[in-house]
Amino acid sequence: MDFAQQHHQATPVLLANVWDVPSARAAAAAGYSALGTSSAAIADTFGYNDGEELSFAELLLLVTRIREQVALPLSVDMEFGYGASVAEVVDNLRALAQTGVAGVNLEDSLVADGERRLVDAETYARRLRAVKTGLEQAGVALFLNIRTDPFLLNRRQALAETVARGQLYARNGADGLFVPCVTEAADIAAIAAAVALPLNVMAMPALPDIDQLTRLGVKRISMGNALHSALQEHLHSLLQNVRQQQSFKGVFSHAGD
C-alpha cells in the first residue's frame, strides 16, 4: 500500500512526527507505517524559530539523511513552500521528490514580523493550482496535504472558514486537508463530511481518542511538535536532577529496559 492509499483505509494513518535520524529510527522500530517531519521540532533542533527561519538547504540535508536511513514513507512539513514564487516552490518540491519523499504539507498562513496571518483563500488556491500544475508538468507525484489555519488562529468563524477553504483547495489540487487545533467532535465530523479530502487532525490534549476520530471520519492523525516537546521536558528534568541530587542514578534508571 502506497502513502496515498494509506489515507483511504477504514482506520486513520497515524504519522510519527520526527525531526532527525534517531527519532525516525525510533518510529520505525515502534512499528509506524509512515513518518512526517515537524517544522517546529526541526527549527528548534537547529536553533531557529518556526516559520521558515531554517533554510531549505538545511531542511533538504536533514530529509536526505532521514530518507537514507529509514525506508518508511515520509511527508515533509514545507510550511509555505520555502519560496515566494511558484517556480521556487516547485523546484524545492522536485528536490524533495528526488530523495524519495512521499508527500508534503503546505500551509495557507505566513509568519511575518512575528505574527502568523492567513493568506486570502482565493489567492492561496491559485498558488496551489499553479504548484500542482508545475509538479505534473515535471512528472513529480507528491501527496499534497494542505494545512488550513482558522482553528490554529482561533478565528471567530473557524468551522465555516475551514470548510470553505477545504472545498476550494479540493478543487485546486489538494490531496488532503490538515486542520491543526480542531478538537471538538462536532467540528471534526462537519469538516470530514463537507470536504471531499482525507482529513488530517493533530494531537492535542483535548483531541478525541483514535477510535472516536475514526468514527468521525478522520483519515490521518499527526503529532506536530508534541513528541519533541515531551522529550525536551524530560531532558531538562534529567539535567536538573543530576545537578540537584549530585547523582547520575536517574540517567540510568531505564538501562536494560
Labelled PLM ranges:
Residues 133, 224-257:
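Extended, intrinsically disordered, low-complexity segments
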Residues 1-76, 82-223, 230-232, 236:
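Alpha/beta enzyme core
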